[in-house]
Swiss-Prot record:
Example GO BP: nucleosome assembly
Protein name (database record): Histone H1.8
Record SMART domains: H15
Tissues with expression: Oocyte (at protein level).
Region (Disordered): 1-50, 122-343
Sorted UniProt keywords: Chromosome, Cytoplasm, DNA-binding, Meiosis, Nucleus
Principal location: cytoplasm
Biased composition (Low complexity): 1-32
Organism per entry: Bos taurus
Free-text function comment from the UniProt entry: May play a key role in the control of gene expression during oogenesis and early embryogenesis, presumably through the perturbation of chromatin structure. Essential for meiotic maturation of germinal vesicle-stage oocytes. The somatic type linker histone H1c is rapidly replaced by H1oo in a donor nucleus transplanted into an oocyte. The greater mobility of H1oo as compared to H1c may contribute to this rapid replacement and increased instability of the embryonic chromatin structure. The rapid replacement of H1c with H1oo may play an important role in nuclear remodeling.
Biased composition, class Basic residues, residue ranges: 132-142
Family statement: Belongs to the histone H1/H5 family.
CDD domains given in the database record: H15
Highest taxon above the source species: Eukaryota
Length: 343
């Protein structure tokens, strides 16, 4: 082989080996680099730039503190203050953000409107509330995560399932009073049983008889007051006639011990008879005087033997008295005097 051909083959092999070595070194470097070391693109969200201004509500509070007035600060003055102090604020979005900030300030009790203000929304004027009078409303708790809510929600249905069990227990408890209500009905049946017998009916007529017996003494008690009525005069007349008869009988008896006689008193006493007779005593009896009274007969005398004629005389005396006819008592006395004269 010619020497020139050998040299050309050596150079071609050296160039191929160098190319393979460079490729292997490049592959080794690529494998040694970490996968996440590549810089993320702008679409994935680059690092946020720092805020160019504080929250709008804080800026509003600063504006109100800077320009405190008696009647409050207008919304236009607040907006001018914010744009001058924080020029980086977007003027186009500021109107919307300012409206939200004022609403939240009123809700939290940080801002108030003047007394006579009737404005609404992002209009009118506002004032700061003093720190002493601020009322911080309770903050709302953070909403639960969906996983936690799913884990706790199933417990609520279990509680709701327990409630029907409680209602069943309440129903069972309500049945017991019904049984108790049914139990008192048994004494009612026992009350009905005695009605069949006659023992319960006996006390009622007995009570009726007792009432009748109690009424009878009332009538008897009412009888004595009637003595002073129209029938009382007839009874007094009967008593007077009986006394006159007893006097005449005593005078006719031969075995009388004394010439004096005592006047027998009735239930109401002899003075009643004297009052009724009054000045109607006949002259013959008045002439005899008190000494002409008949002697008192013994206890077994004949005053008791003549109940029949006395009853008849009493019945006769009940009739109407005529002015011209003398009383029977005077007739009986006259007859007794004739008998004495004949004796």
């Amino acid at each position: 082989m010619a020497p020139g051909s050998i040299a050309s083959s050596d150079t071609s092999s050296s160039t191929s080996s160098s190319s393979t070595s460079s490729a292997s070194s490049a592959s080794a470097e690529g494998s040694s680099r970490p996968l996440g070391s590549e810089k993320p693109g702008l679409a994935r969200g680059a690092v946020r730039a720092p805020r160019r201004h504080p929250p709008v509500l804080r800026m509003v509070l600063e504006a109100l503190q800077a320009g405190e007035r008696r009647r409050g600060t207008s919304v236009a003055a607040i907006k001018v203050y914010i744009l001058q102090k924080y020029p980086t604020v977007d003027a186009l979005r500021l109107n919307h953000l300012l409206k939200q900030a004022l609403a939240t300030g009123l809700h939290r009790g940080l801002l108030i409107r003047p007394v006579n203000s009737k404005a609404k929304g992002a209009t009118g004027s506002f004032k700061l509330v003093p720190k002493d009078k601020r009322k911080i409303p309770p903050r709302k708790t953070a909403p639960r995560m969906p996983g936690q809510a799913e884990g706790k929600d199933p417990k609520k249905p279990s509680e709701s399932k327990k409630d029907p069990a409680n209602t069943v227990e309440v129903k069972k408890g309500s049945r017991k009073p019904r049984e108790e209500r049914a139990a008192p009905s048994k004494p009612g049946a026992a009350k009905k049983a005695p009605k069949k017998g006659t023992q319960t009916k006996d006390p009622e007529p007995r009570l009726g008889e007792a009432k009748k017996s109690s009424r009878r003494p009332d009538k008897a008690a009412q009888a004595p007051p009637s003595a002073g009525g129209p029938g009382g005069k007839s009874k007094v007349k009967e008593r007077g006639s009986r006394q006159a008869d007893t006097k005449a009988h005593r005078k006719t008896q031969p075995g009388s011990q004394s010439s004096k006689s005592t006047v027998t008193k009735g239930e109401n006493g002899a003075p009643l008879a004297k009052k009724k007779m009054g000045g109607k005593v006949p002259k013959e009896a008045a002439g005899e005087g008190p000494k002409a009274k008949a002697p008192v007969p013994p206890k077994g005398a004949g005053s008791k033997k003549e109940p029949g004629p006395l009853a008849g005389k009493a019945e006769a005396s009940k009739g109407p008295r005529k002015p011209g006819i003398p009383t029977k008592s005077s007739v009986s006395k006259a007859a007794s005097k004739k008998a004495e004269a004949e004796g």
